[in-house]
Curated annotation (Swiss-Prot):
Protein name stated in the entry: Superoxide dismutase [Mn], mitochondrial
GO cellular component, one term: mitochondrial matrix
Requisite cofactors: Mn(2+)
Naturally occurring in which organism (per UniProt): Aspergillus niger
Compartment(s) where it occurs, according to its Swiss-Prot or TrEMBL record: Mitochondrion matrix
Top EC category: oxidoreductase
Organism placement in taxonomy: Eukaryota, Fungi, Dikarya, Ascomycota, Pezizomycotina
Length: 210
């Protein structure tokens, strides 16, 4: 293994999402939770390299779940930080920042309100820990709301934006009131980034660049 995965810097300060997401949550979420996924992913990759060198098939098989869980945690959080923006910044205005995506949403769901209601229902329907995503099929631009369990990443379609529904993403501030977290998250969604991912996905197919 020639290089290690690293924790990405946030594109804003830890208090930039207040009052929607507190500074305390952002610091713990980024410095502790995401860093742990990175550390464990690097350890799993090192074990994989060792197993490959020794041709230890049993060891290779045994570490696949660690690679999936921690690799998914790293991918999902790296996307999540980018699809959030400073509270009240221009990027959080859907109409101005994501006209193409807004048109596609209205075409498929009838209105933005219908879409946000549907997305919130999916998020609140997640049992245990997981993620809710708006994804694009690629060149067709077809949009879909999907969920992934635990830290499973989106594979196949292009993730336009995602919402972390693990308790560590909201509990210190919202306690067991998940509905308030889900309703408020729209105020810090980075629609400018979502528009970029949507347009990039409809113009070319390929692996998503973090």
């Amino acid at each position: 293994m020639t290089s290690k995965c690293t924790l990405p810097d946030l594109p804003y300060d830890y208090d930039a999402l207040e009052p929607i997401i507190s500074k305390q949550i952002m610091e713990l979420h980024h410095k502790k939770h995401h860093q742990t996924y990175v550390n464990n992913l690097n350890a799993a990759l090192a074990s994989q390299a060792s197993a490959l060198d020794s041709n230890d098939i049993t060891q290779l098989i045994s570490i696949q779940q660690k690679l999936k869980f921690n690799g998914g945690g790293h991918i999902n959080h790296s996307l999540f930080w980018k699809n959030l923006a400073r509270y009240d910044s221009p990027a959080t205005n859907l109409e101005r920042s994501a006209p193409s995506l807004k048109d596609a949403i209205e075409k498929q769901w009838g209105s933005v309100k219908n879409f946000t209601d549907a997305f919130e229902a999916v998020l609140l329907g997640i049992q245990g820990s997981g993620w809710g995503w708006l994804v694009s099929s690629g060149k067709t631009g077809f949009l879909e709301i999907v969920t992934t369990k635990d830290q499973d990443p989106v594979t196949g379609p292009i993730p336009v934006f995602g919402v972390d529904m693990w308790e560590h993403a909201y509990y210190l501030q919202y306690l067991n009131n998940k509905a308030s977290y889900v309703q408020n998250i729209w105020k810090v969604i980075n629609w400018e980034e979502a528009e970029h991912r949507y347009l990039n996905g409809t113009e070319e197919l390929g692996s998503l660049k973090l």
